[in-house]
């Protein structure tokens, strides 16, 4: 393999590194996706507005909910009400430590920050890491309106230190998540000196900048609930004054950047592979499928991606996959008029669209681990850089079935028509004596009644603060998703079930 070819094959992974490094939270991930979509000519619309005069065949659009879930779609120029929608679903969240509503803690001379666990993280991997803070802050502007500001303190201000081995000889690393998972942020003495110096010089800090009006406050101020200096850092990142911050949602993240690794840079070492890897590939796959100016000219379908928040905690929120986000959007899209609209029957357009649509539920899969090979079923051991993994479970923990597998094989084969080679695929089932995870596929297939298949790129160390994936699998998924969008309309007509 020449260096030029190798570099081209690695480029999608390098682009992913930029995406994931810029996206420590779902809010940032949605912002990163918006930037990619806007650059590709997608127009932002609002869920609260009417789309009847906005969305037209040939158009490309995106919308957000809670700024942590994003849906983007491109409408074929030959669209008619009741036609199919080819969909890819993924999620923007990952297991993290989130700052508690009241986080101001001190212990044994240390300034500490109270955090709570979000999702099922491998929490021992968060010890002894250089942690920054990111999220969104709600701030009051000069005209009195309240807006959100994204914050990313991209330097190590927090750390959760482990106990020295000399003080704990246990073979297993056990700890209490409520009492022993609090990061240190500094020393009390240093904080007191900083506050004293600021007061002596007449500077206002967040601690002594309380309101002078004596207004009733339903809650304690942000600077009372959190360390004043932390609030000052958040305010500085948001470009506002500390007393303009009304509340915030902040998480911790590893400040070590994602990178390529391995002897031949065949690995991606990164946080949040689960599931920003799938979110990135879905976004780029949609963009690439409409990159040609004539891409939608003969397209009778809508091409759509939905990147949901809160998958790691069950999806049962207003912006989760188990909400009305996707059904509501599909209902509105199903009745959009065609470019030659006439007397179209819209009464059953929604049901017609669902019955002919298809959803790829894209969430990361487990690659075989060389040190724990016995944990995997003998004949189903996905390998890194061998392509996306089709996930199957007899008890419907995944939504995959045979018609979907046949469709995906055709899509993977047709990827060669767009240049390059076809996309390799793998199969995965868990052992009978092992529990099986799940994702958004089953809940969406049940809610929509649409055909669904679960798949994802293989990775190691899922839910660790730092995970391992394949460099070339990023490109594999992008090409598969691009081919899915390009060829679904014609391919689906050749597979008969109902």
Curated annotation (Swiss-Prot):
Its EC number is 3.4.11.21. It catalyses: Release of an N-terminal aspartate or glutamate from a peptide, with a preference for aspartate. InterPro entries: Peptidase_M18, Peptidase_M18_dom2. Inhibited by zinc. Stimulated by calcium and bacitracin. CDD domains: M18_DAP. Belongs to the peptidase M18 family. This is Aspartyl aminopeptidase. It comes from Aspergillus oryzae (strain ATCC 42149 / RIB 40) (Yellow koji mold).
């Amino acid at each position: 393999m020449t260096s030029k070819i190798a570099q081209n094959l690695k480029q999608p992974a390098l682009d992913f590194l930029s995406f994931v490094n810029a996206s420590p939270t779902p809010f940032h991930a949605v912002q990163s996706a918006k930037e990619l979509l806007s650059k590709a000519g997608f127009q932002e619309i609002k869920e609260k507005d009417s789309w009847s005069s906005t969305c037209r065949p040939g158009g490309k659009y995106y919308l957000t909910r809670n700024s942590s879930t994003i849906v983007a779609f491109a409408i074929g120029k030959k669209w008619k009400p009741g036609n199919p929608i080819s969909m890819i679903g993924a999620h923007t969240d990952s297991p993290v430590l989130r700052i508690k509503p009241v986080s101001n803690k001190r212990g044994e001379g240390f300034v500490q920050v109270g955090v709570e666990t979000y999702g099922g993280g491998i929490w021992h991997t968060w010890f002894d890491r250089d942690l920054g803070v990111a999220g969104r802050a709600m701030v009051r502007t000069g005209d009195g309106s309240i807006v959100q500001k994204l914050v990313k303190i991209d330097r190590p201000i927090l750390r959760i230190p482990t106990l020295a081995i000399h003080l704990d000889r246990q073979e297993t690393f056990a700890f209490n998540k409520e009492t022993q998972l609090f990061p240190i942020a500094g020393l009390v003495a240093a904080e007191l000196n900083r506050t004293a110096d600021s007061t002596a010089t007449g500077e206002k800090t967040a601690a002594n900048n309380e309101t002078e009006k004596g207004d009733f406050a339903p809650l304690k101020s942000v600077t009372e609930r959190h360390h004043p200096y932390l609030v000052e850092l958040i305010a500085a990142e948001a470009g506002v004054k500390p007393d303009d911050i009304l509340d915030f949602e902040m998480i911790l993240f590893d400040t070590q950047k994602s990178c390529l690794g391995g002897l031949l840079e065949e690995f991606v070492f990164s946080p949040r592979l689960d599931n920003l890897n799938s979110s990135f590939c879905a976004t780029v796959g949609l963009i690439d499928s409409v990159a040609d100016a004539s891409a939608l000219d003969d397209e009778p379908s809508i091409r759509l991606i939905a990147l949901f928040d809160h998958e790691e905690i069950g999806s049962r929120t207003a912006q989760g996959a188990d909400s009305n986000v996707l059904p509501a959007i599909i209902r509105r899209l199903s009745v959009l008029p065609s470019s030659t609209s006439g007397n179209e029957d819209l009464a059953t357009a929604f049901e017609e669209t669902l019955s002919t649509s298809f959803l790829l539920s894209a969430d990361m899969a487990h690659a075989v681990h060389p040190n724990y090979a016995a944990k995997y079923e003998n004949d189903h051991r996905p390998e890194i850089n061998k392509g996306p993994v089709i996930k199957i479970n007899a008890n419907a923990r995944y939504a995959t079935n045979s018609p979907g597998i046949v469709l995906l094989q055709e899509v993977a084969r047709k990827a060669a028509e767009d240049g390059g080679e076809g996309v390799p695929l793998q199969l995965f089932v868990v052992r009978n004596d092992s529990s099986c995870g799940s994702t958004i596929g089953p809940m969406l297939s049940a809610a929509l009644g649409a055909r669904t298949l679960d798949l994802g790129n293989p990775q190691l160390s899922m839910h660790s603060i730092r995970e391992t994936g394949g460099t070339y699998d990023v490109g594999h998924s992008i090409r598969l998703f691009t081919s899915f969008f390009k060829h679904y309309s014609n391919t689906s007509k050749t597979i008969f079930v109902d």
